[in-house]
């Protein structure tokens, strides 16, 4: 797979940015590790299995014993602890208990922060306009919420078959118009009118684009020589499709394609040889992105990408880190620790500054960021020349 070359060589760009970073670091004094909140402890069962205790807040205070809301839009950090779901404002530290939960599953919030996907494909809503749906037998291996409201979830089950569950009545429909294959990743266009998929067909992966009903499917990009696509995402304005390709040579590359001109794509960032990147996430506005690198838990590292440069989200953190998602255009929710150790949640300012400790010992966490100013159209190729070649780009 090839792409449009950048104006500055990738090695040159990384070198220049590295020098700039070092110069800035020298003028700002000796760096220090981020603050650490008091640890959450564990208690043992009769069989000796540790049971996580309730999480503690950054100031060391325990979570409240009651469970009352309502949640606020500013409470963009959601987490699970002590059998309950919580929402926290990362700036004011205002906390709300949302609801009891036994199986949080993916704990993935819809684009308006008013509904969440739980274990067993149950859906829990936070207000009268949001759905409460029981679980179903399907176990989504990959999924994405419908946009801009969250009226459906498109997913692929364990067998890789593409399906859609509707929030009005809970029904599930197969997207039979899509090409055959094993569906590995899915992304909903922010307008809600289109879908993108990574599909494996006989061991070869490709990126497909379709309407929100799975019709008019077009192959945009296909992998060559064993290239795998580990993540896909649309830009917040809906103009571009982004993806991470793990090349057979053993390095990741971040690419984008202009949906109005689908005859080419651009290489943005190349990871080091022998590395693996996934979990691509785009900030809700602006140009920032994040990925997670590493193939095993204790090697995880969250990276922030701007332009062609990637830097660690928490460069002075010794524990494994993982980007969980963007809280706003410049703040990233990052988890440090894990791997059989207590986790700690931080709000990381991509512009610099000390990471802000939020919670220690949460069982699970995710952003609850509200989608705003969503587009209402999908870019169409601006001419015949803007269409992808028959079969896609390789």
Where are these regions (language model features)?
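N-terminal secretory signal peptides that target proteins for export/translocation
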Residues: 1-10
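Sec-dependent signal peptide recognition
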Residues: 11-18
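Enrichment for repetitive, rod-forming helical segments
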Residues: 18-21, 131
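C-terminal motif of bacterial Sec signal peptides marking the signal peptidase cleavage site
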Residues: 23-25
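Sequence signature of WD/YWTD-type beta-propeller architectures
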Residues: 28-394
């Amino acid at each position: 797979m090839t792409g449009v070359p950048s104006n500055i060589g990738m090695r040159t760009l990384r070198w220049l940015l590295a020098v700039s970073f070092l110069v800035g670091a020298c003028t700002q004094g000796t760096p220090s590790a981020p603050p650490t909140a008091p640890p959450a402890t564990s208690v043992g069962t009769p069989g000796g299995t540790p049971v996580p205790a309730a999480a503690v807040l950054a100031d060391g205070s325990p979570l409240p014993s009651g469970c009352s809301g309502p949640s606020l839009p500013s409470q963009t950090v959601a987490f699970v602890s002590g059998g309950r779901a919580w929402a926290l404002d990362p700036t004011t530290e205002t906390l709300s208990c949302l609801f009891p939960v036994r199986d949080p599953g993916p704990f993935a919030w819809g684009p308006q922060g008013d509904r969440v996907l739980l274990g067993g494909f149950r859906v829990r809503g936070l207000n009268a306009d949001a759905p409460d749906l029981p679980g179903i037998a399907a176990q989504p291996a990959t999924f994405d919420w419908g946009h801009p409201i969250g009226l459906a979830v498109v997913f692929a089950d364990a067998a890789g078959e593409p399906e859609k569950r509707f929030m009005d009545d809970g029904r599930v429909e197969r997207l039979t118009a899509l090409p055959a294959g094993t569906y590995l990743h899915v992304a909903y266009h922010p307008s809600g009118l289109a879908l993108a998929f990574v599909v494996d067909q006989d061991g070869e992966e490709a990126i497909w684009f379709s309407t929100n009903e799975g019709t008019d499917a077009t192959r945009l990009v296909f992998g060559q020589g064993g290239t795998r696509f580990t993540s896909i995402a649309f830009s917040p304005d809906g103009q571009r499709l982004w993806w991470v390709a793990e090349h057979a040579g053993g390095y990741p590359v971040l690419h984008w394609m202009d949906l109005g001109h689908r005859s080419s794509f651009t290489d943005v960032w190349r990871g080091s040889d022998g590395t693996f990147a996934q979990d691509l996430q785009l900030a809700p506005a602006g140009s920032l992105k994040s990925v997670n690198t590493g193939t095993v838990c204790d090697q995880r590292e969250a990276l922030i990408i701007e332009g062609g440069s990637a830097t660690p989200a928490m460069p002075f953190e010794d524990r494994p880190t993982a980007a969980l998602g963007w809280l706003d255009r410049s703040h990233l929710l990052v988890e440090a620790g894990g791997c059989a150790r207590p986790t700690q949640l931080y709000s990381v300012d991509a512009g610099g500054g000390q990471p802000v400790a939020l919670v220690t010992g949460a069982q699970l966490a995710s952003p609850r960021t509200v989608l705003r100013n969503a587009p209402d159209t999908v870019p169409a190729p601006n001419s015949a020349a803007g269409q992808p070649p028959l079969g896609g780009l390789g």
